[in-house]
Amino acid sequence: MWGFIVTCGIFLVLLCQLRLLSKRKSKSTPYNALLPNVTVFAMGGTIAGCANSSLEIVNYIPGSVGIEKLIEAVPAIKAIANINGVQVTNMGSENLTPADVLKLAKLILAEVAKPNVHGIVITHGTDSLEETAMFLDLTISTAKPIVVVGAMRPSTAIGADGPMNLLNAVAVASSNQSMGRGTLVLLNDRIGSAFYTTKTNGNTLDTFKSYEAGSLGIVLNQKPFYFFSPAVPTGKVFFDIYNIKQLPRVDILYGYQGLNPKLAESAVHLGAKGLVLAAMGATSWTDDGNEVISSLIREHNIPVVYSHRTAEGYSSNSCLGIPSYFLNPQKARYMLMLAISSGYSIRDIEDLFSIK
């Protein structure tokens, strides 16, 4: 008898707790018809990372916090937009694959097609953030704002930058001033074009820069201020990924003194359908390396794009293959992958990368 009473008591307590939780949830995420709707796709990374100490900013586990907790940590967001959080993956961005990025792009395409969705935010690890951002910039043709955001400090750190970055990203995605600007990268109050923005430092907060192209704007008190009217980067094109099920393998080879020229052959034999060379200087490659590249182009009709290992620079058309011009190796790689997927010939790819 007493056991039955105790069981009933426990049941009632749990029922009350569930009701309280449901009430709290409904209060914490109210819908405001006057606010824009923003969908946040979560991919993991440092912004969702946790460490054992609030002083630890190096040794932590990325992708430890779910999208719900990330949103809850920034209550001011609900005054800016109605948020719909979607967990796509939850890992360090070094482990993301082209398949993951293709999946994300298709999810975003479906989301921006909804008339009630104003903008998109993607939380992402910073290690490969620029690659995902570039892919989205080349495949999502919409005027709606798409903002990729990350953090350099885990969520557990003193002075964690993730919450403010996320708040600013939602503010940018909610603003009509962000319309028609392509995919944007937002960290440390700066707004950059995905086409040009790159990570320049492995540790500091002010790591994402656009070098010669410059920032598009800044965020002050959750309001974006743009320096220019919306414009399309020179050389930017859109690829239709609706029928693409799998992206071809494209490898990046790094130039250095005494490089092994056979590495290019190995990459092709292991399945690479294209190569991007992070060449020395303005597309310098070793003589014996160029002999191998020439043979691969002749025998396999494989596209080879010459980029540069320098932080800035212009890859000229003096190289043996296709110059990437201002695109760094990692950005050129995704453009080449999409071109191959779309059936581009080598001549088409040359025209794609050229700056008229």
Curated annotation (Swiss-Prot):
One of its GO terms (molecular function) is asparaginase activity. It catalyses: L-asparagine + H2O = L-aspartate + NH4(+). Residues 1-22 form the signal peptide. GO terms for biological process: asparagine catabolic process. The keyword Transport does not apply. The active site is at T46. Keywords: Cell wall, Glycoprotein, Hydrolase, Secreted, Signal. It is found in: Secreted, Cell wall. Glycans are attached at N37, N52, N176. Residues 36-356 form the Asparaginase/glutaminase domain. It comes from the Eukaryota. CDD domains: L-asparaginase_II. The keyword Hydrolase applies. Its main location: secreted. Substrate binds at S93, T126, D127. Belongs to the asparaginase 1 family. This is Probable L-asparaginase 2.
